[in-house]
């Protein structure tokens, strides 16, 4: 039996999911207190799910399950204070303990995450699941890209345990699950809600979490895939070291990152970003829509393409809105793989703006 195949099946949740999840701070196992259940359609089968619950660490920390999704950010008890005040009688006392004992940690995560969460939530809110492509790729192209980046095949995915760190709209997770893999998608923003609600494959599972505080058991996954996410955190290197801990021995880590470019247009974009990324999101939205979008749409149209305005807006938001955007030479990233005892390190794809690199985690001697 796959450890967490029936993640949201009520009858198996305590058996299959809880051994995988961990408190992101203490790494202790979590205990579940169910508040209410609901229904979700997987394929043609309506399944009972846990829609509201609270997860308790062995000491101090507690995390809500809201709308069927475990909210496992360090600061989730703040983000979902209204929910917790309603369902946890001693919420005030518990939260005061956390503020007193972990003041510096909480200040750190709030500072580094607040703008990033809002930026990517706003970005993916633009995505139309019925009409839009994901980064100009349809479902077939998305799957082909994933296989090329990871060096896997359709056949090799069967029964694999995969962690998609920064899953965005969640469409790729659904496609991978359809090949017989069990995949856990994690995202830092509330975009995870649409990913979960639009998913119809029971093998694709979703949690909200922070790449620098992964709320899962260490050394568990066959493949950890992190595409275009590390470079949007406050420290690419630190995030790399945090996420690689989730890879099992002989497992694979796959990361996609930006590389430096030496052309004046790219450098101009980076300079513009220094200004736009600091603006309120609502101002950014109209700036891109009214000033940046029309010429970009015209350029695409003159090239014979058929651009969708929402897709172009999403691309503009991804380029100019995130607080952090780092670029790294392949040799630098390769050194991180080496530090963490990975072998068979190779670049699997090279593109205009970035590249994908994979490595196999060696067994400890």
Where are the model-predicted features located?
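Conserved N-terminal segment of class I S-adenosyl-L-methionine
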Residues: 7-163, 167-216, 223, 325, ...
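A short SAM/SAH-binding and catalytic strip from SAM-dependent methyltransferases
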Residues: 222-235
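A short glycine-rich, Lys/Arg-flanked "PGG" loop and its adjoining helix->strand segment in the class I
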Residues: 237-249
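Conserved beta-strand signature within the Rossmann-like core of class I S-adenosyl-L-methionine
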Residues: 250-258
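Short, glycine-/aromatic-enriched active-site segment of Class I SAM-dependent methyltransferases
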Residues: 263-271, 305-325
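Conserved Class I S-adenosyl-L-methionine
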Residues: 266-300
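Short alpha-helix
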Residues: 324-340
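A short linear hydrophobic-aromatic micro-motif
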Residues: 343-347
């Amino acid at each position: 039996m796959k450890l967490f195949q029936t993640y949201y099946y009520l009858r198996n949740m305590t058996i299959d999911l809880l051994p995988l999840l961990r408190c992101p701070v203490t790494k202790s196992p979590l205990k579940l207190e169910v508040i209410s259940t609901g229904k979700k359609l997987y394929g043609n089968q309506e399944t009972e799910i846990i829609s509201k619950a609270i997860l308790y660490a062995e000491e101090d920390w507690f995390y809500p399950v809201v709308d069927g999704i475990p909210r496992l950010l360090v600061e989730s008890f703040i983000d979902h204070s209204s929910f917790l005040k309603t369902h946890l009688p001693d919420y005030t006392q518990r939260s005061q303990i956390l503020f007193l004992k972990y003041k510096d940690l909480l200040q750190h995560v709030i500072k580094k995450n607040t703008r990033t969460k809002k930026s990517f939530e706003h970005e993916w809110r633009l995505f139309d699941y019925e009409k839009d492509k994901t980064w100009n790729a349809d479902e077939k192209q998305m799957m082909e890209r994933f296989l090329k980046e990871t060096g896997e095949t359709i056949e090799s995915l069967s029964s694999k345990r995969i962690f998609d760190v920064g899953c965005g709209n969640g469409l790729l997770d659904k496609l991978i699950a359809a090949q017989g893999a069990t995949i856990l998608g994690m995202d830092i923003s509330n975009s995870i809600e649409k990913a979960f609600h639009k998913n119809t494959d029971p093998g694709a599972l979703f949690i909200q979490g922070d790449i620098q505080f992964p709320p899962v058991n260490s050394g568990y996954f066959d493949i950890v895939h992190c595409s275009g996410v590390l470079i949007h955190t406050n420290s690419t290197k630190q995030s790399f070291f945090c996420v690689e801990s989730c890879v099992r021995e002989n497992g694979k880590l796959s990361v996609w990152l930006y590389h430096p470019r030496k052309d004046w247009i790219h450098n101009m974009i980076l300079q513009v970003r220094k200004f736009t990324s600091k603006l309120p999101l609502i101002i950014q939205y109209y700036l891109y829509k009214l000033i940046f979008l029309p010429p970009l749409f015209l350029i695409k149209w003159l090239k014979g393409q058929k651009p969708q305005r929402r897709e172009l807006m999403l691309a503009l938001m991804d380029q100019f809105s995130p607080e952090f955007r780092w670029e790294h030479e392949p040799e630098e990233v390769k050194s991180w793989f080496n530090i963490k005892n990975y072998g068979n390190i190779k670049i699997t794809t090279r593109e205009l703006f970035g590249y994908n690199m994979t490595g196999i985690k060696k067994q400890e001697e």
